[in-house]
């Protein structure tokens, strides 16, 4: 299947979380923007072949901008950020996943699943783009991460064993506040379903 969507949002009293530094200490604060406009689109694709393979992905593009012309209604001062993209918000990102299934492997009702997924995020500014020298701007960098998973389901899902490798290539990944996430990690899980 293929599906898509268009996004338009006119937000009044948009509250944005900021990251501020005073004397070497960072802290979060909140700023109210009178009006913020978001325009964008998303596309999803998914292909399945029989009951043993599927491939899919999504792409998202969002443009979130400050639309408050005055700093405060009573001040009459023009807002320096009018028309600028709201900082610290990813605006372009995508993911792709692929899964293989081997049904009735070793016994009827057992399934082996192998999966791969990839996440992409375009770089984005941590602070307002028009403030300061463009050559010294702090940006949350572009990110690409790959994950692998292997699972074995026994007796139609009553028992499940799974292993996962997150961030397979050990890339440097960051959250919205440019704080580095954990590197390559391995996980294992055993689950028993006690229902009927």
Language-model features: locations:
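Short, mixed-charge, low-aromatic patches
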Residues: 1-3, 48, 143-147
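Membrane-embedded beta-barrel scaffold of Gram-negative outer-membrane proteins
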Residues: 1-33, 37-39
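Residue-level signal for pocket-adjacent positions within structured domains
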Residues: 6, 10, 25-31, 81-84, ...
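Gram-negative outer-membrane beta-barrel transporters
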Residues: 8-11, 31-125
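Outer-membrane beta-barrel translocator domains and adjoining extracellular loop/strand segments
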Residues: 14-22, 62, 66-75, 125-133, ...
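Noncatalytic linker/hinge segments flanking ATPase motor cores
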Residues: 23, 41-47, 189-193
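Short, intrinsically disordered/low-complexity patches at protein termini
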Residues: 25-27, 62, 68, 77-80, ...
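Conserved C-terminal beta-signal and adjacent last beta-strands/turns
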Residues: 84-196
């Amino acid at each position: 299947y293929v599906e898509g969507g268009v996004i338009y949002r006119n937000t009044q009293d948009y509250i944005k979380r900021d990251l501020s530094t005073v004397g070497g200490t960072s802290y979060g604060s909140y700023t109210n923007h009178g009006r913020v406009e978001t325009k964008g689109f998303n596309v999803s694709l998914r292909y399945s072949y029989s009951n043993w393979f599927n491939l899919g992905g999504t792409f998202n593009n969002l443009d979130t901008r400050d639309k408050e012309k005055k700093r405060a209604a009573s001040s009459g001062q023009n807002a320096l950020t009018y028309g600028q993209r709201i900082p610290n918000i990813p605006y372009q990102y995508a993911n792709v996943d692929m899964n293989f299934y081997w049904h009735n492997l070793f016994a009827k009702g057992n399934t082996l699943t192998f999966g791969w997924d990839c996440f992409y995020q375009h770089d984005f500014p941590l602070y307002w783009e028009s403030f300061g020298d463009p050559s010294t701007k702090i940006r949350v960098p572009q990110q690409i991460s790959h994950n692998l998973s292997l699972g074995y389901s026994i007796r139609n899902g009553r028992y499940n064993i799974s292993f996962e490798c997150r961030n397979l290539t050990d890339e440097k990944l960051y959250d919205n506040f440019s704080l580095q996430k954990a590197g390559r990690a391995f996980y294992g899980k055993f689950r028993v379903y006690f229902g009927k």
